[in-house]
Each structure stands twice: as C-alpha cells, then as structure tokens.
Amino acid sequence: MSDLDEIRRRRMEQLKQQQLAAQQQQGASLEQMQQEEQARQQFENQKKNALRQILTPEARQRLANLRLTKAELVNAIEMQLIQMAQAKRLQIPVTDATLKQILRETTSNKREIHITRK
C-alpha cells in the first residue's frame, strides 16, 4: 500500500506542477493580450485626435457614415489623410468637398463594365 500511496503522491505533485505551469503561461498570454489591447487603444486615440484636427465636423461625419459600409476603405483613407497632413501636402482643415474629391480619386481606380444589347 505504501508504494501505491507514494505513486499517487508523486502523480498528484506532477499534476499540480503542470497546472501551475499552465496557469503561469495563461497569465503571461493574458498580460500580452492586455498590452496589445492597450497599445491598440492608444493608437486609435492618437488617430482620432489627429483626424479631429485635420477634418471639419462635416467631413468627419461623412467618414463615419461611410465606415458603416466600407470600414477598410475608411481606415485606409484616414491613414492617407494623416500621412498627407504630416507631409504638409494637405490644406488643413479638410472640408467635406475636399474629402469627396479624395474619395472619388481613391475609388475611381475600379473598372467600369458597359454591356450593350443589340
């Protein structure tokens, strides 16, 4: 019986160590996820503040409306606007009309297909 008890005790210790190692690993990955989330939030806040300085309220509203249907396009345009403003290639503040022109230029690269029936 003592041999059996000794085997059980060793196995219990081994399981506890494995569980402790797994918990430590989860804690590290949780910390990493929290840091990544915090960095993402900080980036979003910086982007939001930059756009607040670059765009007029009407232009910001247009981007917000467009984001509902084409979020990836809006993100790309926002980054483009920030880069252009930093390079001083953009007259600040960007009005709604200027934003419309930028949107037309970036989306006009698509092909137009015309079908004629005879």
Curated annotation (Swiss-Prot):
Pfam families: dsDNA_bind. Residues 15-44 have a biased composition (Low complexity). GO terms for molecular function: DNA binding. The keyword Transmembrane does not apply. Disulfide bonds: none annotated. InterPro entries: DNA_bind_arc, PDCD5-like, PDCD5-like_sf. Transmembrane segments: none annotated. GO terms for cellular component: cytosol. The keyword DNA-binding applies. Residues 15-45 are annotated as: Disordered. SUPFAM superfamilies: Double-stranded DNA-binding domain (SSF46950). Keywords: DNA-binding. Belongs to the PDCD5 family. This is DNA-binding protein Msp_0595.
